[in-house]
Each structure stands twice: as structure tokens, then as C-alpha cells.
From Swiss-Prot:
Organism: Salmonella typhimurium (strain LT2 / SGSC1412 / ATCC 700720)
Region of interest: Disordered: 36-63
Subunit structure: Homodimer. The ends of the coiled-coil dimer bind to each other, forming polymers. Interacts with FtsZ.
Protein name, UniProt field: Cell division protein ZapB
Top-rank taxon: Bacteria
Length: 79
């Protein structure tokens, strides 16, 4: 009788070990995925910053051209 109990206990322990091993593997996969997603987020943030700088530069250029155009229109009205 005690041998049966021991075998059942051993089977449960082995099942627990197998479950723990699978969970550890899943944790490692999730860590890798998390690292990958973190890198993607950082890359997207970097691209966004670059686009914001480019946008600001283009806005400054547009403002400069608008000022020049207004100056030219003002001269044309004087003539």
C-alpha cells in the first residue's frame, strides 16, 4: 500500500517538475518577446523624434518662404 502511495506521490512530483519546466521555458520566450518589443518601441520613438525634427525644420522653411512671399507681394503693391 505504501508503495502505491509513494508511486502516486512520485508521479505528482514529476508532473509538477514538468509543469515548472514548461513554465520556465514560456517565461524565457516571453522575456525574449518583451526584449524584442522593447527594441521596436525604442526604434519607433527614435523615428518619431527624427520626424518631429524634420517637421519643425520644414515648418521653419515654410515660414521663411511665407515671409519672403509677403515681402514680394508688398513690393508689388507699391509698384
Amino acid at each position: 500500500m505504501s508503495l502505491e502511495v509513494f508511486e502516486k506521490l512520485e508521479a505528482k512530483v514529476q508532473q509538477a517538475i514538468d509543469t515548472i519546466t514548461l513554465l520556465q521555458m514560456e517565461i524565457e520566450e516571453l522575456k525574449e518577446k518583451n526584449n524584442s518589443l522593447t527594441q521596436e518601441v525604442q526604434s519607433a520613438q527614435h523615428q518619431r523624434e527624427e520626424l518631429e525634427r524634420e517637421n519643425n525644420s520644414l515648418k521653419e522653411q515654410q515660414s521663411g518662404w511665407q515671409e519672403r512671399l509677403q515681402a514680394l507681394l508688398g513690393r508689388m503693391e507699391e509698384v
